[in-house]
Amino acid sequence: YSPLALGILARPPGWAPQRDTALRSSLYRRLLPGSEALRQAMAAIGAARGVTQMQVALNWCRSHGASPIPGFRRPCQVIDASQALNWTLTEEERGQLDQLSVESAVRMPNNPFQSA
């Protein structure tokens, strides 16, 4: 389980990866185009609320009863994620994201970094 889909859901629409690990780059190339509409909606919700796209993604997880535990690379990401606890999505926002997720052309692998 990856609440931010390995960071995909925190990436702004139109974002392209820099050089990264071969596995992560491969995943990004596969997942980014198919998640564009969903990420556009998350960016729009974030802009309307004055919050980040990461906060929208984490709130979307929380709206389904999950307690997301994202991984962080930088301290600023911890602060950003903690701000997601200060608000919740409306039913309309959640419904929009749910529908776009169903319509998405790609699915996140179960756990691409899990060892056997």
Give the positions of each predicted feature.
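Hydrophobic faces of well-ordered beta-strands that scaffold small-molecule active sites
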Residues: 1, 68-70
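Aromatic-lined glycan-binding groove of carbohydrate-active enzymes
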Residues: 1-18, 52
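Short, solvent-exposed loop/turn segments at secondary-structure junctions
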Residues: 5-6, 63, 74-75
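Phosphate- and divalent-cation-binding pockets in alpha/beta enzyme and binding domains
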Residues: 8, 77-80
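Terminal-tail/helix-coil boundary detector
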Residues: 17-48, 63-66, 79-116
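Helix N-cap / loop-to-helix initiation motif
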Residues: 51-52, 74, 90-91
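Glycine/threonine-rich phosphate-binding loop and adjacent beta-strand/alpha-helix elements that clamp
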Residues: 56
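Hydrophobic, secondary-structure "cap" segments at the distal end of domains
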Residues: 59-60
